[in-house]
Amino acid sequence: MGMRMMFVVFLLVVLASTVVSSTSGRRAFHGRNAAAKASGLVSLTDRRPECCSDPRCNSSHPELCGGRR
């Protein structure tokens, strides 16, 4: 292999590793975000009776009380 060909292969390897690392980082971020949303929903579910009796909370979180009243 010539020097140009080795340089092109090197650039392709660097480009491929950069693309893989940037996309895997985004997936991890979305995973953390989804986990935080799920955690928030679990904490709201624990307070379901209080939330369903409060009109402001009920309108903000209709999924807890079975829809809008």
UniProtKB/Swiss-Prot annotation:
Disulfide bond residue pairs:
51-57, 52-65
Q: Which residues form a coiled coil?
A: none
| GO MF entries | acetylcholine receptor inhibitor activity; ion channel regulator activity; toxin activity
A single GO cellular-component term on record: host cell postsynaptic membrane
Q: Which tissues is it found in, per the record?
A: Expressed by the venom duct.
Q: Which family does it belong to?
A: Belongs to the conotoxin A superfamily.
Q: Which organism is it from?
A: Conus textile (Cloth-of-gold cone)
Where in the cell is the protein located? Secreted
Glycine amide: residues carrying this PTM: 66
- Let me see what the UniProt entry remarks about domains: The cysteine framework is I (CC-C-C). Alpha4/7 pattern.
- Has the keyword Metal-binding been applied to this entry? no
Question: What keywords are assigned to this protein?
Answer: Acetylcholine receptor inhibiting toxin, Amidation, Disulfide bond, Ion channel impairing toxin, Neurotoxin, Postsynaptic neurotoxin, Secreted, Signal, Toxin
Among its keywords, does the record have Transmembrane? no
Query: What residues make up the propeptide removed on maturation?
Result: 22-49
The record's section on PROSITE patterns has:
ALPHA_CONOTOXIN
- The secretion signal range is 1-21
- Which InterPro entries does this chain map to? Conotoxin_a-typ, Conotoxin_a-typ_CS
- Name the domain of life: Eukaryota
Region ranges (Ser-Xaa-Pro motif, crucial for potent interaction with nAChR): 53-55
Purpose of the protein: Alpha-conotoxins act on postsynaptic membranes, they bind to the nicotinic acetylcholine receptors (nAChR) and thus inhibit them.
Q: What is this protein called?
A: Alpha-conotoxin-like Tx1
